[in-house]
Regions:
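Soluble catalytic regions of membrane-associated enzymes that act on cell-envelope
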Residues: 153-176
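Transmembrane and membrane-interface helices of multi-pass
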Residues: 1-149
Length: 176
């Protein structure tokens, strides 16, 4: 099975940002980051695949890295929010959280690479998850764009023509 998640998972955060800021961001602004994210994922796949036999396992490791990488800031912010006092904030400093994420990455990578079975089921699951996430985000973006076009069309359809304006011959008495 083709690891479609290798291309889709890196663009999920980009699409998420676009879907929350669709009124501000143009498609030209999204193209370059999209190209960079996808080409870096493909570069990692091509480079790391030289050292391992299974390209599907390497794709899962790269996807695992992207998931951890893009979720780090959210988890860090959430933990800071939970532990509000200055004493407890020591638990969520980067020097403590980065090693935890590093260990999570190494454990996940080790498990994926050392499993003797072919990971078709896991690849299918991650592919379906990535397709669903991208589909939801694209649906949000497209529905907003379409609703914007419909609102523009409605506004343009209600324009007042100069011939529709009635000009009164008698001026109002503003001085009483």
């Amino acid at each position: 099975m083709f690891p479609l998640h290798l291309v889709l998972i890196p663009i999920i955060p980009l699409l998420l940002l676009v879907s929350h800021n669709v009124d501000i961001v143009s498609l030209q602004d999204v193209f370059l980051p999209f190209l960079i994210l996808v080409s870096v994922a493909i570069f990692f796949q091509a480079t790391i695949s030289r050292f391992f036999k299974s390209k599907a396992k390497v794709a899962l490791v790269i996807s695992w890295f992207y998931i951890l990488f893009f979720s780090y800031g959210h988890i860090h912010g959430y933990l800071n929010q939970i532990m509000g006092s200055s004493i407890l904030e020591l638990a969520v400093q980067n020097r403590y959280l980065v090693p935890i994420f590093g260990i999570l990455f190494l454990l996940g990578s080790f498990c994926v690479l050392k499993i003797k079975k072919i990971l078709d089921v896991l690849t299918k699951f991650v592919n379906v998850w990535a397709v669903v996430m991208v589909s939801i985000l694209l649906f949000n973006i497209v529905s907003y764009v379409i609703s914007g076009f419909l609102q523009q069309e409605k506004i343009l359809g209600l324009e007042i023509e100069p011939k529709d304006i009635e000009i009164s011959k008698s001026l109002p008495d503003i001085y009483y």
